[in-house]
């Protein structure tokens, strides 16, 4: 995170590799059994450049350099894998998870792979229309893999930098056209009120510099297109399921419909694979953040040699967006993010043991629940194997009924005594879980 500038200089009390949220996310991944690498990248751009095209070029170069550095990091781990595998990684399951600016890096990493994509008209200097000049010159800055250019130190040449999924926290992409069929699966969490990373599509602006670049797409529009291209088809069983995080995301998406995001666009119908974090704060962007004002002033004055007021200003700017910032709030949003991301990572990388969408569809079609709609009882039948566990969840994710230690192909649940509404019935068969909707009336 950090808007591609160093902490304090970016106007924020965050932007370090050891920020609370960043470290907590890495620790949470590690506790789940993942190898977590907290990767830094080159920073710096010029928001005070005189023209909008120069500001856009400066910011996009910063994103571009960060993508190059991240690809170099992936190649580093693949190189190590071939030479002892110090960290015990699985090269068939590499996930890029980015927070704030890191979300931009993750989405750009997965989508930028053609020269034409960085030579769109908005990335050209058109001061002389007869002689357009590319603002991102690969002869100077190198290609998107970090090879060539004047400033790159090429590393781990020959190793793949392929990844298998992208998770974004409040990120966006430079242009929606970058996203194409065949790109890796992706999911996101995002505040519709984010004033920098627009939730739908809009301009990126900084108060002191005005518009930086135009038509940047945030998580809502990115996931809408990724879903429509079929890139996220592998996640369909998760979205059809009844885990509490998916249900919470679906409820939040329904609540977000009709909202106006910071760019002035009215949010449309709910979209799978994005969890909108809607709070009571009108400019909320990073509800997972947590910082200490005293430490912020110390970093500004002692570490960076700036006036103490710079640290105070950074704290006040951030607290204006997140006035109820607290450990409880930060941890709650980190938990929601991890719960939402990890379920999708497991599915996208086949950690759940399902070999294909066809296999999952076959298992799902083998389960019958009737009558549906129901009243006081339902029968669950299986054609594929013995039912081990049945769980029923309300639309808010509350577990309302469980039957465990089962061993039958047909189970009757009676005396439900449930309120009218939509419920999710999760059936476990030989360690595999399928969720179906049940209506109680």
Task: List the predicted regions and their residue ranges.
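Short, surface-exposed "cap/lid" segments of acyl-processing enzymes
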Residues: 1-24, 28
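Active-site-adjacent alpha-helix of alpha/beta-hydrolase-fold enzymes
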Residues: 10-20, 184-279, 286
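Conserved alpha/beta-hydrolase
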Residues: 33-46
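Gly/Ser-rich "nucleophile elbow"/oxyanion-hole loop immediately N-terminal to the catalytic nucleophile
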Residues: 54-68, 72-100, 115-120
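Glycine-rich nucleophile elbow surrounding the catalytic serine of serine-hydrolase chemistry
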Residues: 98-108
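The feature captures the conserved acid-bearing segment of alpha/beta-hydrolase catalytic domains
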Residues: 127-234
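Catalytic active-site module of serine/aspartate enzymes centered on a nucleophile-bearing elbow/loop
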Residues: 286-353
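C-terminal outer-membrane/trafficking sorting elements
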Residues: 360-441
């Amino acid at each position: 995170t950090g808007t591609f500038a160093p902490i304090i200089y970016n106007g924020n009390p965050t932007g370090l590799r050891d920020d609370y949220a960043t470290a907590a996310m890495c620790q949470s991944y590690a506790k789940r059994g993942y190898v977590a690498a907290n990767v830094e990248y080159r920073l710096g751009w010029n928001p005070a450049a005189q023209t909008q095209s120069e500001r856009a070029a400066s910011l996009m170069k910063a994103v571009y350099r960060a993508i190059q550095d991240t690809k170099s990091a992936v190649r580093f781990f693949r190189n190590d894998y071939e030479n002892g595998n110090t960290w015990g990684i699985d090269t068939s399951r590499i996930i890029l998870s980015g927070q704030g600016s890191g979300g931009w890096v993750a989405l750009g990493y997965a989508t930028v792979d053609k020269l034409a994509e960085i030579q769109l008209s908005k990335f050209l200097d058109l001061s002389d229309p007869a002689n357009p000049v590319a603002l991102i010159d690969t002869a100077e800055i190198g290609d998107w893999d970090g090879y060539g250019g004047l400033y790159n130190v090429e590393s781990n040449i020959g190793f793949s930098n392929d990844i298998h999924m992208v998770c974004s926290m409040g990120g966006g992409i430079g242009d929606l056209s970058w996203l194409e069929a065949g790109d890796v699966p992706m999911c996101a969490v995002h505040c519709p009120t984010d004033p920098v990373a627009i939730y739908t599509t809009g301009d990126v602006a900084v108060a002191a510099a005005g518009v930086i670049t135009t038509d940047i797409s945030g998580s809502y529009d990115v996931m809408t297109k990724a879903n429509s291209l079929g890139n996220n088809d592998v996640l369909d069983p998760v979205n059809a399921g009844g885990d509490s995080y998916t249900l919470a995301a679906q409820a939040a998406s329904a609540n977000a419909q009709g909202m106006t995001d910071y760019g002035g666009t009215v949010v449309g119908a709910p979209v799978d694979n994005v969890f909108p974090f809607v709070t009571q704060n009108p400019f909320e962007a990073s509800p997972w953040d947590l910082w200490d004002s005293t430490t912020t002033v110390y970093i500004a004055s002692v570490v960076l040699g700036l006036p103490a007021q710079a640290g105070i200003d950074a704290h006040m700017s951030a607290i204006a967006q997140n006035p109820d910032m607290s450990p409880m709030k930060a941890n709650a949003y980190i938990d929601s993010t991890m719960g939402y991301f990890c379920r999708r990572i497991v599915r996208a990388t086949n950690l759940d043991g399902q070999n294909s969408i066809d296999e999952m569809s076959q298992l799902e079609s083998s389960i019958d629940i009737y009558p549906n709609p129901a009243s006081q009882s339902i029968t669950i039948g299986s054609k594929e194997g013995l039912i081990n566990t049945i769980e029923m969840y309300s639309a808010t994710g509350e577990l309302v009924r469980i039957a465990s230690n089962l061993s039958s192909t047909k189970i009757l649940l009676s005396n439900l005594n449930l309120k009218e509404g939509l419920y999710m019935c999760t059936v476990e068969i030989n360690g595999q879980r399928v969720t179906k909707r049940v209506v109680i009336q």
